[in-house]
């Protein structure tokens, strides 16, 4: 079956729109679908996503498609960019409409709610073994990507040919550098754990602890990510790359991050509900914290920062008390062999 579009993007929030803009700016015919018909009509009329990326015009190659069946029939390349808690639902909705030659890639960052499973497991449960899978991950703020500011990400998948073709589709010498990676698990995990640590970094700054504390938290957060990755069979080298250290530093240090701003509000005394309302968009790290905590407990992986953030978000502990507990932990060597 021939493609009438080079790629279809499912998810018309800020990040899905930004990726669609980037792809279309490369000259690729890109279809953008979202779940809200009224929102899609507005996008088609305005030729921009005023709600999430105001003032950034759509390239000529970007087309709005409100009909999911038509969007999925147009291309065998499907990029899913929806919140992690609806990832499985969207795949289930798409399944009967997918082409036989479809290939699925996602930029969703997170794990399955309640179970803490990787999204690859969710995708296989919903779709079976038929379709090649891939994931995009790395330090990307949607606004900067949509504006064409220099950005770098990584891509990994189950099919080397699909991964290579995604690199070609996404890569742009002027705006986006794309690195191929063979660690499918590591790329998925990095995108979830960094959201949790970013909340902690925000809480630390909201309390007023300063740059020293924030840097220590980022560094030890990377240790927690690496421990969890090793337990799942990921490569430790991945966590020194775009999807690990890169995404962690970006999300923990810049207020474009909703997770960081959420943590800032908590550190300044807001309760969880008020902080979420203050952000005004989905705070992926809120759910990710429970998911990562659940996964770590199941695997027996020690993640003290994640545990304290979980207690703040779900058990009512104050950020100050969480910080005190972390600082008061038993002394130990930084070198894992000792």
Swiss-Prot record:
Alphabetized UniProt keyword annotations: Cytoplasm, Lipid biosynthesis, Lipid metabolism, NAD, NADP, Nucleotide-binding, Oxidoreductase, Phospholipid biosynthesis, Phospholipid metabolism
Active site: 194
Catalytically driven reaction(s): sn-glycerol 3-phosphate + NAD(+) = dihydroxyacetone phosphate + NADH + H(+); sn-glycerol 3-phosphate + NADP(+) = dihydroxyacetone phosphate + NADPH + H(+)
Enzyme class: oxidoreductase
Chain positions recorded as sn-glycerol 3-phosphate binding sites: 109, 138, 140, 194, 247, 257-259
Chain ranges passing through the membrane: none
The keyword Lipid metabolism belongs to this UniProt entry's keyword annotation: yes
InterPro entries: 6-PGluconate_DH-like_C_sf (IPR008927), 6PGD_dom2 (IPR013328), G3P_DH_NAD-dep (IPR006168), G3P_DH_NAD-dep_C (IPR006109), G3P_DH_NAD-dep_N (IPR011128), NAD(P)-bd_dom_sf (IPR036291)
EC number annotated for this UniProt entry: 1.1.1.94
Stretches assigned to coiled coil: none
Molecular function as annotated in GO: glycerol-3-phosphate dehydrogenase [NAD(P)+] activity; NAD binding
Entry's localization field: Cytoplasm
Pathway involvement of the protein, from the record: Membrane lipid metabolism; glycerophospholipid metabolism
Source organism, top-level taxon: Bacteria
Keyword Magnesium: no
Pfam family, one: NAD_Gly3P_dh_C
GO CC annotation terms, alphabetical: cytosol
Principal subcellular localization: cytoplasm
NCBIfam families given in the database record: PRK00094.1-1 (NF000939), PRK00094.1-2 (NF000940), PRK00094.1-4 (NF000942)
Described function: Catalyzes the reduction of the glycolytic intermediate dihydroxyacetone phosphate (DHAP) to sn-glycerol 3-phosphate (G3P), the key precursor for phospholipid synthesis.
UniProt similarity note: Belongs to the NAD-dependent glycerol-3-phosphate dehydrogenase family.
Protein name: Glycerol-3-phosphate dehydrogenase [NAD(P)+]
Gene: gpsA
């Amino acid at each position: 079956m021939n493609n009438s579009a080079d790629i279809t993007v499912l998810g018309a929030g800020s990040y899905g729109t930004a990726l669609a803009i980037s792809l279309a700016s490369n000259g690729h015919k890109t279809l953008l679908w979202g779940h809200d018909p009224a929102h899609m009509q507005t996008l088609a009329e305005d030729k921009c996503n005023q709600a999430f990326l105001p003032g950034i015009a759509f390239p000529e190659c970007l087309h709005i498609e409100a009909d999911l069946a038509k969007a999925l029939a147009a291309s065998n390349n499907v990029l899913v960019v929806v919140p992690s808690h609806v990832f499985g639902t969207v795949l289930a909705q798409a399944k009967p409409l997918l082409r036989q030659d479809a290939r699925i890639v996602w930029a969703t960052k997170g794990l399955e709610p309640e179970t803490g499973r990787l999204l690859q497991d969710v995708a296989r449960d919903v779709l079976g073994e038929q379709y090649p899978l891939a994931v995009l991950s790395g330090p990307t703020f949607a606004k900067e990507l949509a504006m064409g500011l220099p950005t770098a990400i990584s891509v990994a998948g189950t099919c080397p040919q699909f991964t290579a073709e995604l690199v070609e589709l996404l890569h742009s010498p002027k705006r986006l550098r794309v690195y191929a990676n063979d660690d499918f698990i590591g790329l998925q995990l990095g995108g979830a754990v960094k959201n949790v640590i970013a909340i902690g970094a925000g809480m630390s700054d909201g309390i007023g602890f300063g740059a020293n504390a924030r840097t220590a938290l980022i560094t030890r957060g990377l240790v927690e990510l690496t421990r969890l990755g090793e337990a799942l069979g990921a490569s430790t080298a991945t966590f020194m790359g775009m999807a690990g250290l890169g995404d962690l530093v970006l999300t923990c240090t810049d207020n474009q991050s909703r997770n960081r701003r959420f943590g800032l509000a908590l550190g300044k005394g807001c309760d969880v509900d008020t902080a979420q309302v203050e952000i005004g968009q989905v705070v992926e790290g809120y759910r990710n914290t429970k998911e990562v905590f659940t996964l770590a407990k199941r695997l027996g992986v020690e993640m003290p920062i994640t545990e304290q953030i979980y207690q703040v978000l779900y058990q009512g502990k104050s950020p100050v008390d969480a910080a005190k507990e972390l600082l008061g932990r038993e002394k130990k060597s930084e070198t894992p062999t000792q």
